[in-house]
Amino acid sequence: MTKPENYQEGVFSVAEDLADLWTGFCFEQGVAGCEILQEADGEQRLKCYLTEPQKLDEWIARFHSEYPQAIGKLELVEHRLCPNENWRLGWHDHFQPVEIGRTLLIAPVWYERELPENRQVIWLEPGQAFGTGTHVSTRLALEMLELVILQEAQVPPSLIDVGTGSGILGLAAARLGISKIIACDNDPVVLPEASHNFELNQQGQHFWGVVGMASVIDETAPLVISNMLLAELKSAVVDLARLTATGGTLICSGLLTEQEAPLATALAKYGLRICASTEAEGWSAFAFREAGRF
């Protein structure tokens, strides 16, 4: 994977009530990371890092179109292009190792200090794909994935990752013993990055990449996972249910906590019920199984 000639930084002033939803939206647009610069008087200043120049002012209009109920301050305060040689420097302070759950640890590829020996390390480098473990929805998805796998009497043989992004969820599954990861994404730029991250972690033999979303996959798996926003999850409900093998588990993250009911109602039509959930900072992840299997 080649590095971009420049990367872009955008700073937004966001009403505190919108901050989590806006951050999740930014990751869906392809930011490699976000950090809070300042919090005061009910507002946050958020800096976003991108590997390709974007028309950031258009994001705000798109956000309000997708979330008409989201009311509050949202302004682009500053944006600039930075030379690629500063890319890694800009990330050193922001993207630090983070422990997730009981066994996982996400670390940037350049990190040189000693890491805990009792953790399964997933090495990543910033890219255009969503998923570095820095956003709470990714962290919750990883925690739920770990919980489900560790509770099984036997490690499931395969997993389908819908909307794979950086491949971080599939990588975690491979680290936890799953031998076949089918990863799909409708952005063709993303799959080479996910494949690169699998190779970086010596897990390339476990990766099967598919361009497109859930509808293009014609097999099932005992474990299916998707970290997407509610609208995307709801549009994929039929296929998410279809891909989940009989007796299997579907994990969904990327939801605000109050969005549980719409997704649960949609999946209940296919016999899937919530069997586990986890929540942090206003976001939630859920595991679904057939009624009677929990």
Q: Where are the regions a protein language model picked out?
A:
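Conserved beta-strand segments that form the floor/walls of ligand-binding pockets within enzyme
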Residues: 9, 13, 105, 123-125, ...
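SAM-dependent Rossmann-like transferase core, predominantly class I methyltransferases
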Residues: 85-153
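Conserved SAM/SAH cofactor-binding pocket of Class I
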Residues: 128, 132-217
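N-terminal auxiliary segments of SAM/dcSAM-dependent transferases
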Residues: 4-116
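S-adenosylmethionine
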Residues: 186-294
